[in-house]
Every structure is written in structure tokens, then in C-alpha cells.
Amino acid sequence: MMTTVADNEQFSIDALELGPMENFIYLITDKKTQRAAVVDPAWDVPEILKLAEQKGVTITDILLTHSHHDHINGIEAILDKYDAQLHLLKTEAQFWGQHLDLPTLHRGGDRIQLGKSEIEILHTPGHTPGSACYHIDDQLITGDTMFVWGCGRCDLSGGDPNQMFDTLNKLGQLPEQTVTLPGHNYSDQTTATLHEQCEGNPFMHFHDVDKFVDYRMHIHDKVRHGPYHAELQHEHE
């Protein structure tokens, strides 16, 4: 299923929900040049290619939020069709350890030029050491760092709940009208503003890192089940 989640004079962002893990794959299109970037290509690549063809765009860039299999298993099929440049954080490439053909390795704060549109890459560790979010205008593609009303697991290889606490605090300082576009459809709505996240995402309610770590690692998965719903701030302070 395809949904247009952002559309203005300069760029558009379309979301495809694909695969058995309810992944969101995003296609960012620069309207002036008809260049497109696909974020976390995975699962049903023919659907991604079909969307690009329908829009009349050329995929020139692949942006990775992190290196888990469910976010990367379509890379080779995209590269078979398009001569696209692969982008990820250097920290994630080192964690991943895979041989990549001349990817562009970034540091947090770098900017990627997609035609006339500029995309900022943010280093958001926690789920993995080199997890990234992609910030374009008032849209924030968050991968498995932040879901609507949730955040990524920190118990897998490379996960760190202390880093996740710091990351979410930093994201919470972005403009409140920023729209978060998550890597999975785990919730009762597919997007949320940061204002809504700060109000309804329990992981945004903590001021004490130890309480956050205990909740993320030991409590959350026992008391919350999908689809996630907003939870107003209460005992987590």
C-alpha cells in the first residue's frame, strides 16, 4: 500500500508498507530534477520500482537508517536497475562490517543534496551504533530509532538503551511541528508530530536515564502490545 506522506512545491515523500514486518520504505522525490532517494529498500522491490516508474523518477540515491536485514535486503535489486549512490553513517558501516561498493559514508550533521532538495543526516544511536534519521524540511524519517508511540529495541547486537535515552532527548528538541516517519507500522496511526510524540510516546516521558533503561529493557514489552496507542505522561517522570 502506498501513501503520500509529504507533498509540497519542492519535494514529495511516498511511503510503501512492505514485507512481513510491516516495514515502511520511503521514496523522496525532488520535483525539479525528478531525482529520487529510496530509504531502506527491502522486501518487495518490484513495488518500489513500480512506484518510481509511475512517478517518472530516477532513483539516484539509497539512504540507510541502519543495517538490519529487514531494512537492506532490497539494495542489490535496486542497484541492478539504477546506478544509485548508497549512503549511511560511517559508524554503521563499521558495525555492519559488510563489503560495500564505494558507499558514501557520512557523519552526523552531513547534508545530502538530492537535486534542489537538501537532506540532513542525524546520528541517532541506540538501536544500533550508527542508526540515522533523515531530516528534510519538517519531515523526519526515523527508521527504528523512533516509532509512533514507541522506540526501537536496544537488546539486539549493538543496541544501547543509554544512547537511546540521549538520542530521544535530542530528537525531542527539534521543532514540535516536525513529522516523524517511522520504519515500521506498529501503531494506531502511521505518522505523528514531535509535539504528539512528546505528549503520547511513553519513551519521551523519562527524565531519569536509569528509569528509562529499566522500562525499555525489562518492562515495556511485557505491558504494551501492538498496535501502540498514545499514552499520556504519568508515572514515568
List each language-model region with its residue ranges.
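Accessory terminal helices/loops
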Residues: M1-T4, N8, D166-E237
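Conserved beta-strand hairpin/beta-sheet module of binuclear metal-dependent hydrolase folds
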Residues: T3-K55, C133-G143, V148-W149
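Active-site HxH/HxHxD metal-binding segment of metal-dependent hydrolases
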Residues: E22, T33-A36, W43-E120, E199-D210, ...
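Core dinuclear metal-dependent hydrolase active-site scaffold
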Residues: L27, G109-I136
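Hydrophobic "anchor" residues on beta-strands that sit immediately upstream
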Residues: A36, Q85, H123, L140, ...
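Active-site metal-binding loops of divalent metal-dependent hydrolases
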Residues: P41-W43, S67, E92, H127-T128, ...
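Histidine-centered catalytic micro-motifs
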Residues: I62-I72, L122-P129, L181-S187
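Active-site-adjacent loop/tail segments of enzyme domains
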Residues: C151, L156-Q173
